[in-house]
Design a protein with these regions (language model features):
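Basic, Lys/Arg-enriched alpha-helical interface segments
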Residues: 1-57
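Basic/aromatic recognition patch in beta-strand/loop cores that engages polyanionic ligands
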Residues: 39-40, 48-80
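Enriched for short, Lys/Arg-rich terminal
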Residues: 73-99
Length: 99
């Protein structure tokens, strides 16, 4: 059985900021491509969410075409993936999301 996905407010804000950035500095096509890439990564996580553990119980899934990492945790008992943040890897590591 696949996991359900719960996206945090911080992650939603991260995604909105990335889309706004790509709309402003590139094109709407690039912004749509970012959203498509994010959704594709989430779909890849759902059937098998056991990616690399980054910190404590937080896992990471790097995006391929964009410099972002998806941070998430698992509730294995209830089969829920909690997406905590979508972090731009071009920012300094000091700015990593406070998990």
């Amino acid at each position: 059985m696949d996991y359900k996905v719960n996206v945090s407010l911080i992650a939603r804000t991260n995604i909105r900021e990335a889309v706004a950035y790509y709309k402003e500095s590139a094109t709407i096509k690039v912004a749509k491509s970012f959203v498509k890439e994010y959704e594709s990564n989430v779909k890849n996580i759902v059937p098998n969410p056991f990616y690399q553990v980054h910190y404590r119980d937080h896992r990471v899934k790097p995006m391929r075409k964009f410099p972002y990492i998806i941070f998430y945790t698992l509730d294995e008992y209830n089969k829920i993936i909690y997406i905590k943040a979508v972090f731009n890897t071009h920012k300094t590591p000091i700015k990593y999301p406070k998990l």
